[in-house]
Amino acid sequence: MAPMLPPRRLRPFSAATATLALACSSAAHAATTSATGNASATVLTGAPSTVASTSGQGGRATTSTTATTSNTTPAGDAQPDADGVLSDHRYDHTTVTASPMNALRQSVGLSRMPHDAMHTPQNINVVPQVLMQQQNVKSLDEALKNVPGITASVGEGEGGMAGDQFLIRGFQSQNDIYENGLRDFGVYTRDSFDYDHVSVIKGPSSEVFGNGTTGGAINIVTKAPHLGNAYQANFSGGSGSYYRGTLDINQQLTNSIAFRLTGMGNENNVVGRDYIYSHRWGIAPSIAFGLGKKVSFVLEYFHQNDNRIPDYGVPVVYKPGQAIGRPVTEYGVRRTNWYGTTYDQDNSSDDMITGRLTAHVSPILTLYNDMRGGIFHRYFSASQEACSSMAAGTTAYNNNLINGSVPSATCNSDFFSANPASAQVARNGGVGGPEPYRQSDWSIQDVFSGVARFKTGRIRHEVIGGFDIEYVTDHRQNYAYGSNRASTSLLNPSMYVPGLVLGDCNQYPDRLVNISGVGKKCYKDSDALDVGFFLSDQVWFTDYLSVKAGFRWDNWNSHYSATGGDTAKYPDVHYGQDETTINPSVSIMYTPRSNLMVYFNWSQSTTPLSMYVTNSSEPMTAKSQSAAPERSSLYEIGAKYSAFHDRIGMTAALFRLDKSNSIQTDPTTGDISATSDQERNQGLELSISGTLLPNWMFYGTYALYDPTITKAGSSTSKQGGQIQYVPHNQATAWTSYEIAPRRPWNMTVGGGLTWRQGVWLDQANTARAPATVEFDAMVSHRFDNHWRVAMNAYNLDNRLNYGSLFSNRVTPSIGRSFLFNVSAQY
């Protein structure tokens, strides 16, 4: 029997964990920012990769852009390519001026999409490094708050069921997080200490990424070694016993070899939530060979260890006489209330090693091979609260009876009675799960691709092709409580449950959760193999008009087994699924100038139900193994304009996204299931980013959505209703201004707004979370060219907002908090 775990206590912060740094960006050639806040950058034309990176302090930034193209145009007869670049020589150098805040001039970050965001025919939101630095971003979740259409169901500081879980344009993207173009299979909360910038590719993108990407894909571009030496250390401290240190060292070893090391130590409580904390550390060394050469290779290792308390927030309740449920905190219950037990914990250890090879074989052909192996370990135990009014004899009531939570069956009515203190909340979600588990995964992926640029007569081509092989396996061992997990007070909860014992699943087999089609099982094993082939051709009929068409073929083969427990009552089960999919895309681009593009894009994506091997405890059941995959189609027309010598980037996109056989995620277990729902989200997305005036940076986005359930395939959906978690309106804005740059009394002041309209929490549109409004601010000062101090303030008016959203509960966001930061850069 596993011993009862003591209450988790905050460890004192170790000075060793604070040795540390936010990084100088990766760059092949560095350039120094001018007094206007713009940056000179060297552009190298020849190879089909684009790398844009920035590093800045208080509005002063360094940017380096390497944009590479080539063709076979003879010397003396040079013609501008689709990007407006003369490419009659393979290594032409041109100097341009760009703002490090201009998202359009950032790379997407993967070889299969070799152009920058400006020249990619799809709406792409890029969170540049200078923005993350000014906001003191510490996690992927915090970075993505700058992107419209992103909703977190689990995120940094809020904890939750399965690490980072995001929705893009209202659709699940839990398996659509990539790092340098390779899928990150891990289930953990991602720290941002090794980030250069983050790209969000909106809309179905299976032609590039393979299965998944219904709403889009998130691609993290990490810091990479570069020529030249750079050293930076950073320390933050503030509200919530917050202590954080980061380190970034880049060392040039030879004229073509460089080494880089980034590290992080972080300990914090969550302001505005009781007992929630995160203790984590990470390290990411990398070495690059062949910098500036025709053949280069980058080897990277990443490790992150995280011990945190998961937070399932507060329950939704229904006031008598009102049909719409709201978070219980909207009726005066304290936002700090946490309904977990001393057993709750989320401990993860994640390791990845990545190799990226680039070979410029000839002026017209470049080959890439990217490979990654990952090992992920996790122990997870959480309490999921529910406050309901249940009728005796129902399944929900009986589950409460089994788990000793009978008082919670009348929690809702008790709360609105004359004696609200009598309300008791269940800690098992009212449906008995999920049980604690230990998870071990490993994965491997290899993507080989080539980019060829050539002419057939007077028509130019850019052909991208290759193959993608990925394999992932997951093993879970469940645990069971030997006694009842009793309910607790809704108004004054306690984490202590006297006599509660957690044991091995074989010790208490009858205490396991009974999953339909699976039973009460002890061990769960799953694996999946995906083999994909992709090919596309962009054809320039004139210097300004081009058409790109492509497809990807995938074969997805997965298996799932549930074994152990009381096999006499619940026999072992074994399921499998084999899906072959073809996903096309077609784009039309009109580029009258290198800084202006108007485009149309049509693309499709496919998501097999068995795809979520590491993200779900039951990736397959008897019902879902034969279910058709989810299909999505995107129609998008947009324009991108980089104005005033690339100082300001502006985008506008109109889109319609249709999805059939919608996948739904169980709010308690995280298991996925198919319905015959058909959904449509259509709308408008706008963005502007860059340097508006000398020393004045701005980053703003807006989204207008019309998310509709066009066909309800089950009684839990409302035909004509609004898709859950998707607001009609959403906007973000951040601005900063540098006063008296390079003067002893210099100062940078900044601030921002995050606004999201209220959203429905379920497909039936019976529960709703109110609008989110958050005001943040920043002030910084530079002592010289090396030292900087800053103060960041978050949620200045201490508004009760909700970050992570579920169908029957929500997690309050952080309260008002302040972080002091000091950094040194040499």
What does each model-found stretch correspond to?
Residues D543, R656-D658, A674-Q763, D797:
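Gram-negative outer-membrane beta-barrel transporters
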Residues A288-G292, D441, R460-V472, K524-K659, ...:
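Structural signature of Gram-negative outer-membrane beta-barrels, strongest in the C-terminal barrel
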Residues S55, T65, V85, H89-G228, ...:
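Acidic, small-polar-rich N-terminal luminal/periplasmic segments of exported/outer-membrane proteins
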Residues F193-D196, E207-P285, L291-V295, D351, ...:
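Outer-membrane beta-barrel translocator/receptor signature
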Residues T754-D762, R768, S780-Y826:
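C-terminal beta-signal and adjacent terminal beta-strands/loops
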Residues S256-F259, K294-F297, I364-L367, R458, ...:
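Repeated loop/turn-to-beta-strand initiation elements of outer-membrane beta-barrel proteins
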Residues H360, T366-R372, F376-R378, A382, ...:
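Membrane-embedded beta-barrel scaffold of Gram-negative outer-membrane proteins
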Residues N268-V271, I283-H360, I364, G374-D441, ...:
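Acidic/polar loop-and-plug regions of large Gram-negative outer-membrane beta-barrel proteins
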